[in-house]
């Protein structure tokens, strides 16, 4: 299991919240105090809640559930794309389209269009079009790739969602809640924790804090997926052994006859 230490959290600045005048009173249980007009998050709580979130993500991945990483603010974009890709999952890091989950069937049509355009450029079909038409389709492809590239291979709704800054990603969280998709999130002092199933109290603005926590969640996904693969592999080997034993038994009976 990938643990997280107080030292790591401090070095990444996870304890720095928002200005005291910009807070959500529901975050009071997660706040240690205030310093120079800034709320300080209780890192002991962060360690405890992170452990719970990590275990949930790991177990969810072990059951075969997929994860959608969501973080569209500038500070989160790179970490979200890199870590989701590293653990073989999906991400949205540019713009959340309303209905991305609740109207997924329509979004899938746009994904199919993107895949079709990709294929046209890869197999040379695009050369049959005029330069002007090809340029227009290339721009369409770029636009679709920017918004849908991270979910291009997501064929069904995700099993859970990991969110950086649920206040900023309010629509995404609302859609997940409406569909019963569990949400794990980095929750800063200005957020509403009631919307989140697994709260990780922490700084959702600093790049280092975002990168640390996102990488750890990706580790949880990978650990769960690896455990699942071991079980599936041993199950397949067991089935092969059983088939071989049955074949031997049939052969023995045939020779006895």
Curated annotation (Swiss-Prot):
A single cellular component GO annotation: cytosolic small ribosomal subunit
Entry keyword Ligase: no
Classification via Pfam families: Ribosomal_S2 (PF00318)
Protein name: Small ribosomal subunit protein uS2
Organism, scientific name: Trichlorobacter lovleyi (strain ATCC BAA-1151 / DSM 17278 / SZ)
Keywords, alphabetical: Ribonucleoprotein, Ribosomal protein
Similarity remark: Belongs to the universal ribosomal protein uS2 family.
Entry keyword Transmembrane helix: no
InterPro entries in UniProt: Ribosomal_uS2 (IPR001865), Ribosomal_uS2_bac/mit/plastid (IPR005706), Ribosomal_uS2_CS (IPR018130), Ribosomal_uS2_flav_dom_sf (IPR023591)
GO biological process, one term: translation
GO MF annotation list: structural constituent of ribosome
């Amino acid at each position: 299991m990938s643990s997280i230490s107080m030292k790591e959290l401090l070095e990444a600045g996870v304890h720095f919240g928002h200005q005291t005048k910009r807070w959500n009173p529901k975050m009071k249980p997660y706040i240690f105090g205030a310093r120079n007009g800034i709320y300080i998050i209780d890192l002991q709580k962060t360690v405890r809640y992170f452990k719970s979130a990590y275990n949930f993500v790991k177990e969810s991945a072990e059951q075969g559930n997929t994860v959608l990483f969501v973080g569209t603010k500038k500070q989160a974009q790179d970490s979200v794309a890199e870590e989701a890709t590293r653990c073989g999952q999906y991400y949205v890091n540019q713009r959340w389209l309303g209905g991305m989950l609740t109207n997924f069937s329509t979004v899938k049509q746009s994904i199919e269009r993107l895949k079709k355009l990709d294929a046209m450029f890869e197999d040379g079909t695009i050369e049959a079009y005029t330069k002007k038409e090809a340029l227009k389709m290339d721009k369409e492809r770029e636009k679709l790739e920017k918004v849908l590239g991270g979910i291009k291979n997501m064929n069904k709704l995700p099993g859970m969602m990991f969110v950086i800054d649920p206040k900023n990603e309010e629509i995404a969280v609302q859609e997940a809640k409406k569909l019963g998709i569990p949400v794990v999130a980095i929750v800063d002092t200005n957020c509403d924790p009631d919307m989140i199933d697994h709260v990780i109290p922490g700084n959702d603005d600093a790049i280092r804090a975002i990168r640390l926590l996102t990488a750890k969640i990706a580790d949880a996904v990978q650990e769960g997926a690896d455990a699942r693969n071991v079980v599936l592999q041993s199950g397949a080997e067991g089935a092969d052994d059983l088939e071989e034993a049955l074949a031997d038994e049939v052969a023995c009976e045939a020779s006895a006859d």
